[in-house]
Amino acid sequence: MERKSALELIEKYDNLLVVQTFSKSRSMAGMRIGFACGNPQLIRFLNDVKYSFNSYTMDRTTLVTGVAAIQDKAYFTETCEKIIATREWAKKELAALGFTFPDSKTNFIFASHKSCPAKEIFEALRQEHIYVRYFPKPRIDNHLRITVGTQEEMEKLIHFLEKYLKNHK
């Protein structure tokens, strides 16, 4: 599976930051670790304001764990491959159910359904304790942000949507 990165673009564009969290690719969501690459001036600006956005500094355990995660390239590769495979499977299944979405290489699918409003789907999913994001904002108010979970989580989502959409045509 092909993986792409925008890292090479930071040499070309001095206003570009490439940001990566450890949440999915390194299975460390609770530790709130991430990094940014880009123009040194932009990185300095980030350092100047970082406590305004995240007042929780990383303790020694978090730092050691983060370094170990970066060094474990095999786990990172395996996790990314699983996320990509699950995402591609879910996109195929969602498309078969009538969803559309932009082509993306992210860890989420920004989907809309041709005949069922996103808000209705969102509320039905929430009743089943299946959580996706819904933003009641102009231009995106008929879209769901579906984070790529485990294969089992995505199967649960798809199975529910199959039943729900069958009954709501």
Question: Which sequence ranges carry the predicted segments?
Answer:
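Short hydrophobic/aromatic beta-strand micro-patches
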Residues: 37, 110-112, 147-149
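PLP-dependent aminotransferase class I/II
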Residues: 15-94, 99-102
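Structural motif corresponding to alpha-helix initiation and N-cap regions
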Residues: 3-4, 19, 115-119
